[in-house]
Amino acid sequence: MAKKVAVLAVNPVNGFGLFQYLEAFFENGISYKVYAVAETKEIKTNSGIELVADDVIANLIGHEDDFDALVFACGDAVPVFAQNADKPYNVDLMSVLKAFAGKGKLLIGHCAAGLLFDFAGITEGKRLAVHPLAKPAVSKGMATDEKSVVDGNFYTAQSENFVWTMMPQVIEALKK
C-alpha cells in the first residue's frame, strides 16, 4: 500500500519544484497533504501565483505518525530564513523535521532542503544534494555536487531542475 506524505511548502514556494512532487504523487496514487510553512494556509509561488495549502505547519505537530514521509518544497522564502528563523512557523519547521527524522521517516526535498535538514541537526554522516550557494553552510551532513542523492531515508536534489532525477527512487520508496 502506498505511503502518505506531508508536503511542506514555504511562502513563497518554487512552484516548479512543488508541483513535480504533487503531480508525481497524484499520478502514482500516493496520498499527500500540503502544509504551508507560514502563519496562514494562503501562500504564493515565487512567480506570484496564489495557492491555498491544506493546512499550516503548526497543525502537523503531533501528527507525524499519520505520515510515512515528508517533502520540503523550497522557494524564495529560504534565502531569508535566517532573518525569520524565530518566526513560529520556522520554529515549527525545525520541530517537525526533527520529529520525522526521529521516527525514521523518509525526508525528501530539493534546493536548500538538505541545508534545513542540517540546521535541524538530523543529517549527521548523510550525503546531501544541495544548491551550490547553500553547500558551504552544511556542517553536519556531507554536501555533494551531485544532482540528486539518496542516502538512507534522505532523498535530496540540488535544485528544482533535478527533482526528476530522484523521483523514480522516491516513488518506488513510497509505493513499498
Task: Locate predicted features.
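Active-site-adjacent pocket-lining segments in enzyme domains
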Residues: 3-19, 23-36, 40, 53-176
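A cross-family phosphate/adenosyl-ligand binding-site feature
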Residues: 45-46, 50-53
